[in-house]
């Protein structure tokens, strides 16, 4: 759903284990090709706070920094069929430049961090833009069927998209 490390840190392992193909919004590509942007959070935090000793310890744990290249990308929208499932992807910038939401089948809507029930959408990180979220993304999301089942990147699953949008703030 977007390029932040808490959403992509298992991507390489999943691709290798499942021969999985990836699809993401164009703006993720530059970010995910830079190893400084894909460092596991624990490694980054300890490296800064504890220096070389922490980096050596974490290397022994085999925590890896990987870069990623997509199999497919899209700019604004994408529509494709995967077996019997129809998938639609929508660029939803605001939380990050590369944020995207995905409608899978007739009912499922994966929002990543574009909608996080009970929390304000974080737009203060690099690439975030509260104005774009409020002026472009939220109005677009309100055009989608409100009865879609919402699966956010964090928090409670199972509410409807309409319920998630009624609570959205930034």
Regions found by a protein language model. Name each.
Residues 1-79, 169:
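Active-site HxH/HxHxD metal-binding segment of metal-dependent hydrolases
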Residues 9, 32-33, 84, 118-120:
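Activation segment
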Residues 79, 86-170:
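Metallo-beta-lactamase
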């Amino acid at each position: 759903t977007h390029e932040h490390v808490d959403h992509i840190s298992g991507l390489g392992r999943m691709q290798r284990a499942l021969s999985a193909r990836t699809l993401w919004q164009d703006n993720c590509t530059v970010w995910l090709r830079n190893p400084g942007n894909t460092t596991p959070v624990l490694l980054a935090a300890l490296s800064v706070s504890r220096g070389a000793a922490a980096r050596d310890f974490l290397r022994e744990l085999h925590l890896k920094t990987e870069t990623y290249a997509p199999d497919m990308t899209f700019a604004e929208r994408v529509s494709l069929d995967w077996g019997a499932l129809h998938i639609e992807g929508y660029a939803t910038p605001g939380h990050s430049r590369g944020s995207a939401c995905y409608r899978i089948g007739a009912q499922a809507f994966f929002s990543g961090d574009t909608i996080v029930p009970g929390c304000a959408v974080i737009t203060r990180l690099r690439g975030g833009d509260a104005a774009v979220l409020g002026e472009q993304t939220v109005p677009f999301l309100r055009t989608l069927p409100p009865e879609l089942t919402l699966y956010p990147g964090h928090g409670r699953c199972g509410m409807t998209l309409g319920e998630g949008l009624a609570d959205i703030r930034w």
